[in-house]
Amino acid sequence: MANTTSAKKATRKIARRTAVNKARRSRVRTFVRQVEEAIASGDQAAAAAALKAAQPELMRAATKGVVHANTASRKVSRLAQRVKALSA
């Protein structure tokens, strides 16, 4: 348990940041899931639209430090590859 005033404040700040990060991570997962569902349904137009919405969300999460930049880039790349394969 935190004893000093500064440690107590740090604990409160961590709790707030954790809540924000959890919400951002959940939002990213939702967008990625929408892309994967569109890919699974075979709808190329819907998959492309979902990817277009998911990409900035993933990169924003990377900018904010919620996910690593390389992780976000890898996810975008792999999703784009799968969407492109639908049109082939």
UniProtKB/Swiss-Prot annotation:
Residues 1-21 are annotated as: Disordered. The keyword Ribosomal protein applies. This is Small ribosomal subunit protein bS20. It comes from Sinorhizobium fredii (strain NBRC 101917 / NGR234). SUPFAM superfamilies: Ribosomal protein S20 (SSF46992). One of its GO terms (cellular component) is small ribosomal subunit. The gene is rpsT. It comes from the Bacteria. Belongs to the bacterial ribosomal protein bS20 family. It holds the Pfam family Ribosomal_S20p. The keyword RNA-binding applies. Keywords: Ribonucleoprotein, Ribosomal protein, RNA-binding, rRNA-binding. HAMAP family: Ribosomal_bS20 (MF_00500). GO terms for molecular function: small ribosomal subunit rRNA binding; structural constituent of ribosome. One of its GO terms (biological process) is translation. InterPro entries: Ribosomal_bS20, Ribosomal_bS20_sf. Binds directly to 16S ribosomal RNA.
